[in-house]
C-alpha cells in the first residue's frame, strides 16, 4: 500500500514538508477531520470542498507505482481455491482500490469494496460488522481482519474479530502494540500460519 504517503505527497505538491509525526496524528482522524487539520496546520491554499479532489489525484498517482508485497498473490489464490470469501475495507475510495487491484491482477479475488470513511471509519466496529454481514457471516471470531494500522486492528480486536497484523514501514513505531492485538503478526505474507486461520 501507500501507507502514510498521500498526505505527505499532497503537502509536497504545495511546497510544504510533513512533520515527523504527521502519520500518527492523522491515524486517529477521519478523512474530513484530517483534511481540515492539513489545511489549517500547513496553511494549504485549499478549501475543504476542494481537498478531496486533490487528494484523489495524489492517491491515483501514488497507486500507479504500488506493487504487491511478496506472497500476496499466492495467499489470495490459496484462499480463493479454498472458498474463502474476501473483500476490501479501506480508508481509500473504492474506485481507486479497484483500479490498482485490477492493474495488479487480483481484483477478481474480492467480492466487494467498503469505504471506511466518516461515520463508518475503522475507529468504529460497525464497519467491520456490516462487512461481515455482507460476506454472509455473523460470528466475528470466524472472520479474519488483516490490518497494518494499529487503531483499526484495535477496533477489530475489541469487537471479537480475528486480527492478522501486518508489518508496514508506515506503522513501524506501532509494531509492539499491533502485535499485542493480533492473533498472528506477519512481517511477510509468506509467514502466515495456515493452522491459525
Pin down the residues of each PLM region.
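Active-site neighborhood of HAD-like aspartate-dependent phosphohydrolases
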Residues: 1-24
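Short, acidic loop-to-helix structural element flanking the phosphoryl-transfer center
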Residues: 60-88, 94-98, 125
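An amphipathic alpha-helix signature
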Residues: 4, 8, 31-36, 48, ...
Amino acid at each position: 500500500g501507500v501507507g502514510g504517503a498521500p498526505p505527505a505527497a499532497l503537502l509536497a505538491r504545495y511546497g510544504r514538508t510533513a512533520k515527523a509525526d504527521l502519520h500518527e496524528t492523522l491515524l486517529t482522524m477521519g478523512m474530513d477531520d484530517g483534511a481540515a487539520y492539513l489545511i489549517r496546520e500547513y496553511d494549504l491554499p485549499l478549501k475543504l470542498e476542494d481537498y478531496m479532489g486533490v487528494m484523489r489525484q495524489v492517491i491515483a498517482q501514488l497507486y500507479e507505482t504500488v506493487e504487491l508485497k511478496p506472497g500476496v498473490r499466492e495467499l489470495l489464490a490459496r484462499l480463493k481455491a479454498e472458498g474463502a470469501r474476501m473483500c476490501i475495507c479501506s480508508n481509500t475510495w473504492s474506485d481507486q482500490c479497484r483500479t490498482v487491484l485490477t492493474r495488479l491482477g487480483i481484483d477478481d479475488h474480492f467480492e466487494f469494496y467498503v469505504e471506511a470513511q466518516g461515520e463508518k471509519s475503522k475507529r468504529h466496529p460497525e464497519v467491520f460488522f456490516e462487512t461481515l454481514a455482507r460476506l454472509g457471516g455473523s460470528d466475528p471470531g470466524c472472520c479474519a481482519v488483516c490490518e497494518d494500522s494499529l487503531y483499526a486492528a484495535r477496533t477489530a480486536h475489541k469487537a471479537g474479530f480475528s486480527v492478522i497484523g501486518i508489518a508496514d514501514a508506515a506503522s513501524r513505531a506501532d509494531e509492539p502494540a499491533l502485535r499485542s492485538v493480533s492473533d498472528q503478526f506477519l512481517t511477510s505474507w509468506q509467514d502466515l500460519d495456515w493452522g491459525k486461520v
